[in-house]
Amino acid sequence: MDLMVSTSSAQEGFCLIQQFHREYKRGNKLDVSCRTSGSISSKIPLGSRKRNRLVLVSAASKVESSGLNGRAQKFETLSSGYSNSNGNGHYSSVNSSFALEDVESNNHLRQMVRTGELEEGFKFLENMVYHGNVPDIIPCTTLIRGFCRLGKTRKAAKILEILEGSGAVPDVITYNVMISGYCKAGEINNALSVLDRMSVSPDVVTYNTILRSLCDSGKLKQAMEVLDRMLQRDCYPDVITYTILIEATCRDSGVGHAMKLLDEMRDRGCTPDVVTYNVLVNGICKEGRLDEAIKFLNDMPSSGCQPNVITHNIILRSMCSTGRWMDAEKLLADMLRKGFSPSVVTFNILINFLCRKGLLGRAIDILEKMPQHGCQPNSLSYNPLLHGFCKEKKMDRAIEYLERMVSRGCYPDIVTYNTMLTALCKDGKVEDAVEILNQLSSKGCSPVLITYNTVIDGLAKAGKTGKAIKLLDEMRAKDLKPDTITYSSLVGGLSREGKVDEAIKFFHEFERMGIRPNAVTFNSIMLGLCKSRQTDRAIDFLVFMINRGCKPNETSYTILIEGLAYEGMAKEALELLNELCNKGLMKKSSAEQVAGKM
């Protein structure tokens, strides 16, 4: 694109047009030059002409080096010309306000934005505008985006306000960034407010951003109103627009209404793509109409759209969730026969379902065939299998596949290790569990809270609370905050070991940390007290439990009744049992069981 401006003198000729960025982005060649209406007067001294040329070259080089390849700064030449009052042609002033000062300021702002100095950039922008400089919208848009990413939409909105009042003209990209920031922050009303006041026409991206936010918030009716406004402003929906609305309609109003929207989409000349069809297939499956979804899948090619692996995965998952795993296996075989390349997700859907159903042999067959079809199993492929072996107490097979997994270059994740640790602890192999836990960090897998809780609980149940407490200290050192499960395990273990006073100490530490004890924790303390023939303290603890807002359960009362009987107060125990039954606090069947043990 040839951007030339006719001027009456060379110093007025240097001009950058506001549309520079858009033309550059479109790939048009820009020729920014000046065209003079006549030759430069011979009366102008050669030195002055050279200085004038240097001003132009300097400005041009600053523009070039500043990277103004986007929506460029508008430079104007407001020179006062040459003064010839004395007839000697001296250069009186070149008040160049295609503004080197603006260029320098914008360069500095741009540099701040590039280095992530958002707050400093904001202050500099305010100072720029205060001194009359016109900001370039490219770094300002980047500033808006940066603050939006930090959730500081108010600061971002202030930048947009500064831009609008400075003489700069924000374009649709700037507004889209601001609207997107509001939508991501859940401030949809503010986004709509920006849409209403935009000084340029919104584009399809603007509307799609707002429609996505409204639909995700369950505001389908309002989204349809925005669609109407979009059409009124001659902004035509694209496939993304309709797919957003079809997905929301499937969720909120059902597939029947979504199909009407699909028809409208076609009537407007907008062709659905595979993503649109996948949304509909998913909606049909969620309504429990699997056979209809399969028919829809088979009809897609005749509608001009080939299903992809995601389409098949949706159907496959629905087949598995409804127990039709044999159909799922047939669908996988059909995919392979037709030349579709299944993804690792495809295989994992089937493996996961078969393992949950205890069909480990079939799951192994599928896992072993994956490499033949260009898919390497990942940790999500092995984890269900390991869990299945652990559930069936086949620890040898679980360890075998764990080793096979590693030998094939697939490294276990924390879910893998948690599965193995849980199984080892349940099997009483807590020392093995501790050994694995100690090796996790060296294997590049950081333990999480559930990892520690699993081993702490295993140690506590195995009567090794000393080691469990050491693990508690270790997890605290790693900034992992203990929870109710952590303390309940320790309190229970200490109580069972007869260390009830130490258990009570941990209980109060528990409370000081703001962790709310549950009935299991209270019951553990009461059981420890009753076993140490301190039923009176156990009764006090029951009262304390009620005062703390924790409702006793049948186990709480059973512990106390058995504690009274254990201390030779069978009569009092029976009286309490009858009273609890009469008040409906214990079932008659439970009371009879307790009475039978006395």
Swiss-Prot record:
It comes from Arabidopsis thaliana (Mouse-ear cress). This is Pentatricopeptide repeat-containing protein At1g09900. Belongs to the PPR family. P subfamily. Coiled coil: none annotated. PPR repeats lie at residues 101-135, 136-170, 171-201, 203-237, 238-272, 273-307, 308-342, 343-377, 378-412, 413-447, 448-482, 483-517, 518-552, 553-587. InterPro entries: Pentatricopeptide_rpt, TPR-like_helical_dom_sf. Transmembrane segments: none annotated. Keywords: Repeat.
